[in-house]
Amino acid sequence: MRNFTLRKRFLESKCGTRSSFKGFVMLVVMMLMTASSAMAEGVKFEVIDGFRYLLDTGAKTAALMPKTDGNYSGDIVVPEKVKSSDGVDCSVVAFADGSFSGCSGLTSITIPSSVTSLGKSCFRDCRGLTSVSIPSSVTSLGENCFCYCI
């Protein structure tokens, strides 16, 4: 086992093998950069026609997300497919956790047949909601999905 000391802002071993340590650091940095770019490839947030989505252009899927600048309101019809900024058609397959949570001005929503799951607290506190069209394709309802809607 080697002893390391800190000198002149460089970590160097007592036997003077500074280059092996630098090589190790470079290897770790390269591995982290490769892993992070592979994970992020094709996955991005976009606002399309007033809806915020998490798009996976590789899988050609989209999840409707909560808005970051206010709430959804009125009568809403969610499209079955959306086109990403780079031209990829993505099927809307899910509503994320809290997608419409707290949207008291939301009165009705039509969910497309491409959607298979509604996340936790998806419509929580949507007190103005009077009509929801849920297709048979939806097989998963998150916990508290319609909590405090009446």
Where do the language-model regions lie?
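Bacterial N-terminal signal peptides
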Residues: 16, 23-35
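Boundary at the C-terminal end of the N-terminal hydrophobic targeting segment
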Residues: 38-45
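Structural signature of tandem-repeat unit edges
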Residues: 57-58, 71-94, 103-117, 127-140, ...
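Non-globular, low-complexity intrinsically disordered regions
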Residues: 63-65
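N-terminal secretory signal peptides that target proteins for export/translocation
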Residues: 1-19
